[in-house]
């Protein structure tokens, strides 16, 4: 070892491989791939952006709040968690914004953070609560907007969500543990630990087609990849916070789902990098008849 040098793990991907997909965004946290062939992102003043894979940016709607995570249905409607409004809002392709879910049973959403659909159109939502208070929870919203608490015991700032292969479990980032847990969706069962980090703040998650889990860390500025045996590899790292600047959410995009797009809350752009293994396809349910 070189004298005076502290070694660290070598990332799998050099930062030079990352490119800017889109810039001029207002500190984007959420990013999602739509069934219409566009990338979607949000801004901290409520902006909703529709972005071509060539980088063309259009702001097509505004929630008026602070957009965190987002996903889409089969009719290209965007479902966005707005932490300032305390709601999951739905934005049509033409830009009309309405409330989809704000809580149930006398329990309002406190800090809605990330939504993900299953094949049946159930929308799972993380409600992070307040940092350090352990008051977060998971919700499930049925097609049409009626929701209920799914778990009260995933409370340590639940954040990014990813539906597991086969749809039998939900992987949940618990940012203040910090780590990732697996929540069974069929028949109840115990919450299981996927990985526990040290001195990191994980934020977003996404599966690839081989079942490996990509985890973006808000701090330090890293992306990790976890295999099916729970072994973690450093995928990318940016100690200068220029390419990956507080990376929050990430999504596999493009026609073949081989373009990994990363939102950098600390700056004004979306980054992208090509990967060898495509992402796991998402669900885009048709909800028009029940909404």
Predicted feature locations:
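Beta-rich, blade/repeat-based domains predominating
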Residues: 23-36, 43-45, 63-82, 87, ...
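A short beta-strand motif characteristic of beta-propeller blades
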Residues: 17-22, 55-61, 97-106, 146-152, ...
């Amino acid at each position: 070892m070189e004298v005076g040098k502290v070694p660290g793990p070598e990332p799998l991907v050099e930062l030079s491989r990352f490119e800017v997909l889109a810039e001029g965004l207002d500190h984007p946290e959420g990013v999602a791939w739509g069934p219409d062939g566009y990338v979607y992102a949000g801004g901290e003043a409520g902006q909703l952006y529709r972005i071509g894979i060539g980088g063309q940016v259009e702001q097509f709607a505004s929630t008026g709040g602070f957009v965190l995570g987002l996903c889409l249905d089969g009719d290209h409607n965007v479902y966005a968690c707005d932490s300032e409004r305390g709601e999951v809002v739905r934005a049509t392709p033409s830009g009309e914004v309405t409330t989809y879910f704000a809580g149930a049973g006398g329990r309002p959403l406190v800090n809605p953070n990330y939504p993900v659909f299953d094949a049946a159109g159930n929308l799972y939502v993380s409600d992070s609560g307040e940092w350090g208070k352990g008051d977060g929870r998971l919700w499930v919203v049925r097609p049409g907007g009626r929701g209920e608490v799914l778990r009260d015991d995933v409370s340590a700032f639940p954040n990014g969500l990813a539906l597991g292969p086969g749809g039998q479990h939900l992987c949940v980032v618990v940012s203040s543990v910090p780590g990732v847990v697996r929540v069974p969706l069929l028949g109840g069962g115990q919450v299981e630990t996927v990985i526990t980090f040290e001195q990191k703040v994980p934020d977003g998650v996404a599966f690839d087609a081989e079942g490996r889990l990509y985890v973006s860390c808000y701090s330090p500025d890293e992306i990790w990849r976890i295999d099916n045996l729970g072994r973690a590899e450093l995928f990318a790292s940016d100690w200068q916070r220029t390419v990956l600047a507080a990376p929050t959410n990430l999504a596999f995009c493009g026609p073949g789902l081989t373009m990994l797009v990363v939102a950098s809350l600390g700056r004004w752009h979306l980054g992208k990098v090509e990967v060898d293994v495509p992402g796991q396809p998402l669900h885009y349910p048709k909800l028009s008849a029940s909404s």
